[in-house]
């Protein structure tokens, strides 16, 4: 990977809405070079998607997020990959990580309601033959996600004094 690719990835990670013209100026390369480099990174699977960071608390959309620690038995000749693939195919699962430590996989999951999320864990996830245990942690509040701070800049930070 060359320096231009690394520079573009760093810039796009911060703001993927920047026009090609601005990216060309920021990197000191021609518009054509930048466009071709980005196109090649998309074709090669380096850039998979452009997506915003959304503060869902400021919308009417109800949703429940959780992180689930999963202990599994790895499969012969496939290790954790086959188990992870089976799990990441569930619609509720947004992210899957292979972890070191007390558990094997960490899932970031999302459902519309607590009941839906509980149903997912009890009937879909924990019933898989390779899953030996789970621990579910519900997200109560987001402070930062993908490098973006979820702070209300207009919030009154004075302490409330009651008589």
What spans do the regions from the language model cover?
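A compositional/biophysical signature of low hydrophobicity enriched in polar/charged and small residues
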Residues: 1-163
